[in-house]
Amino acid sequence: MSGAPQFALRPFLAEDAAVVAQIFRESIVALTGDDYGEAQQEAWASAADDVATFAKKLGGQLTLVATSDGEPVGFASLEGKDKIDMLYVHPDAAGQGAGATLAAALEKLAAARGAEKLTVDASDTARGFFERRGYVAQSRNSSSIGDEWLANTTLKKELKGATP
């Protein structure tokens, strides 16, 4: 077998909590350094320090896990029916299609749930990824995490096939 890796998707399970929290942290530390300082990265990654609380948040949303050879390599969550809350891929799997697979699945699920649009507050690192998928910038934002301020951009995509 050759070509790009194939990623399977499945629902988030409680036993995924530790590995998904690790993916979250490692993705932030390894992939966002060109856009955010070390203190900003540490503040951002601290959201997964309490694995139980992190798991509870993901368990309360529609959360999918991307796997390669049965091992989790990324995850994404849909808040409500029309907002991507999180989409993170392990640095070793970045750029191989796991993020695109997760985003496409959330877009289909949102449309199936009747959403006419999908929004995301994308980090400066992820903004280009979403723009290549047809998302359009709506506003620039600053949010505080502890003593740190992080910039992001709210983007929106009109969904085709949404049911009225």
Could you tell me what each predicted segment is?
Residues 130-131, 135:
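Conserved active-site tyrosine of GNAT-family acetyltransferases
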Residues 97:
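Glycine-rich phosphate-binding loop
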Residues 126-127, 146:
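Short secondary-structure capping/turn micro-motifs that flank functional sites
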